[in-house]
Swiss-Prot record:
TM region positions: 30-50, 98-118, 127-147, 165-185, 203-223, 248-268, 300-320, 336-356
Coiled coil location: none
Main location: plastid
Similarity section: Belongs to the complex I subunit 1 family.
Protein name listed in UniProt: NAD(P)H-quinone oxidoreductase subunit 1, chloroplastic
InterPro entries membership: NADH_UbQ_OxRdtase_su1/FPO (IPR001694), NADH_UbQ_OxRdtase_su1_CS (IPR018086)
This enzyme's EC code(s): 7.1.1.-
Organism of origin: Nicotiana tomentosiformis
């Protein structure tokens, strides 16, 4: 049987095209993930710079000013310094738990960004259970902190890990109940649907006005989940040296440093999505498409405006947790647990009951 050379060349060209399609398909799948990771990294750098500048202003001192223009590259310089430091491991600790703990904390928070809409349907995964996916994933992070504390074989580290687990359990329940109230109000658990439900009524349709009690409980619970003052008991310097971070150095310590700011950013983004209308500007009697002529200029410009509005709301809200760091004193452990179980939990349950009743009456 004789096969023509042209047929062989045609078959080879088809196989090359198929392989190129597979490569391009993989690149196209990874491109949104890479873009999201790059955006999150830049966002964390901006948060660190903002916190240092605001903290310097509150304390009436000069903030970072040498690393880059206005000191904006200070966080990058700190990260480079941590990368170059020696990575020490306790000789008497559990090496596996000690090494895995920081990675679990960072990865679980990173996954939360996959359900955050930064613009009109600009979301990595528009899940029907988006907000509860975030709550489920974020509950894994304290497991990593507990593993880090136990694997360090240090009493201060272990106590810090236990505190992190107890604090997370205490405040995740009120947080979840507030999110459930929002889901009932929006008739959906998708983050995109929640934003669109708020956009129907303009500025006064934000869940900030429709759920004021839930917003306050959500704000306090998210601060506790981020372990920000006055809820930073797992790493209280005066009591536990550095808590579960005591034995860490180098890149592993840097992962905890990144995780804290990632958690702060994701909490602020969810406040924007759940309570502040997301990517909708919602100025009374003025809508973003008519204001900027988005319908005339195409979807790309509208998407960019949506991203800008979302990030602007997020960074404006970030002033609250940064200001509370230098305003409020740290709570005791018994005060923290009492606040979560005796006050926030009953209030969030009452808010859920009121929301359910109002939804039934509106039918």
């Amino acid at each position: 049987m004789i096969i023509d050379t042209t047929e062989i060349e045609t078959i080879n060209s088809f196989s090359k095209l198929e392989s190129l399609k597979e490569v391009y398909g993989i690149i196209w799948m990874l491109f949104p993930i890479f873009t999201l990771v790059l955006g999150i990294t830049i966002g964390v750098l901006v948060i660190v710079w903002l916190e240092r500048e605001i903290s310097a202003g509150i304390q009436q001192r000069i903030g970072p000013e040498y690393a880059g223009p206005l000191g904006i590259l200070q966080a990058l310089a700190d990260g480079t310094k941590l990368l170059l430091k020696e990575n020490l491991i306790p000789s008497t600790g559990d090496t596996r738990l000690f090494s895995i703990g920081p990675s679990i904390a960072v990865i679980s928070i990173f996954l939360s960004y996959s359900v955050i809409p930064f613009g009109d349907h600009l979301v990595l995964a528009d899940l029907s259970i988006g907000v509860f996916f975030w709550i489920a994933i974020s509950s894994i992070a304290p497991v990593g902190l507990l593993m880090s504390g136990y694997g360090s074989n240090n009493k201060y580290s272990f106590l810090g890990g236990l505190r992190a687990a107890a604090q997370s359990i205490s405040y995740e329940i009120p947080l979840a109940l507030c999110v459930l109230s929002i889901s009932l109000l929006s008739n959906s658990s998708s983050t995109v649907d929640i934003v669109e439900a708020q956009s129907k009524y303009g500025f006064w349709g934000w869940n900030l006005w429709r759920q004021p009690i839930g917003f306050i409980v959500f704000l306090i619970s998210s601060l506790a989940e981020c372990e920000r003052l006055p809820f930073d008991l797992p790493e209280a310097e005066e009591e536990l040296v550095a808590g579960y971070q005591t034995e860490y150095s180098g890149i592993k310590f840097g992962l905890f440093y990144i995780a804290s700011y990632l958690n702060l950013l994701v909490s602020s983004l969810f406040v924007t999505v759940l309570y502040l209308g997301g990517w909708n500007l919602s100025i009374p009697y003025i809508f973003v498409p008519e204001l900027f002529g988005i319908n005339k200029k195409g979807k790309v410009f509208g998407t960019l405006i949506g991203i800008f509005i979302t990030l602007a709301k997020t960074y404006l809200f970030l002033f609250i947790p940064i200001a509370t760091r230098w305003t409020l004193p740290r709570l005791r452990m018994d005060q923290l647990l009492n606040l979560g179980w005796k006050f926030l939990l009953p209030i969030s349950l009452g808010n859920l009951l009121l929301t359910t009743s109002s939804q039934l009456l509106s039918l």
